[in-house]
Amino acid sequence: MATSELSCQVSEENQERREAFWAEWKDLTLSTRPEEGCSLHEEDTQRHETYHRQGQCQAVVQRSPWLVMRLGILGRGLQEYQLPYQRVLPLPIFTPTKVGASKEEREETPIQLRELLALETALGGQCVERQDVAEITKQLPPVVPVSKPGPLRRTLSRSMSQEAQRG
């Protein structure tokens, strides 16, 4: 199966705003595949000859960064599919305007970043309402050390206990 690929690169730079954008994606894939239901097989038992031929087709897959995918067979038209939106990196980077500012003066964390942080903590198994061990032990009743019992004192005399055992 032969395959050819075409990649695209786009880069943009804005010197005034000090911004840059760069993207690369695999745009077009053309592959030769055996065509289903298009094969020929002949066998001549007298001459001990066989002939086999498999039909081939060129499959086309075209992707775009706008979440559109086109699939089909070369020469027969392509079927277009709109892919579902998926959040991918890079996320917009948040930097506070005043690094040394107090908590009230700072800007709020962007919603996308808050959602990502919440997802990471949920997937990481971290508990939001986490308490230290010292705080948990403060809520417990105090631990009373177990005292060792002394030697057991007999309440019955030896002769009475032997009689009780005999029945």
Curated annotation (Swiss-Prot):
GO BP terms in the entry: adult heart development; cardiac muscle contraction; cardiac muscle hypertrophy in response to stress; cardiac muscle tissue morphogenesis; cardiac myofibril assembly; detection of muscle stretch; otic vesicle formation; sarcomere organization
GO cellular component, one term: Z disc
InterPro entries linked: Telethonin (IPR015667), Titin-like_dom_sf (IPR023111)
Subcellular location: Cytoplasm, Myofibril, Sarcomere
Compositional bias segments (type: Polar residues): 157-167
Entry keyword Oxidoreductase: no
Modified residues (Phosphoserine): 39
Main localization (coarse): cytoplasm
Top-level division of the source organism's lineage: Eukaryota
Keywords: Cytoplasm, Phosphoprotein
Assembly and binders: Interacts with MYOZ1, MYOZ2 and MYOZ3. Interacts with CSRP3. Interacts directly with the N-terminal Ig-like domains of 2 titin (TTN) molecules. Interacts with ANKRD2; the interaction is direct.
Biological function: Muscle assembly regulating factor. Mediates the antiparallel assembly of titin (TTN) molecules at the sarcomeric Z-disk.
Name of this protein: Telethonin
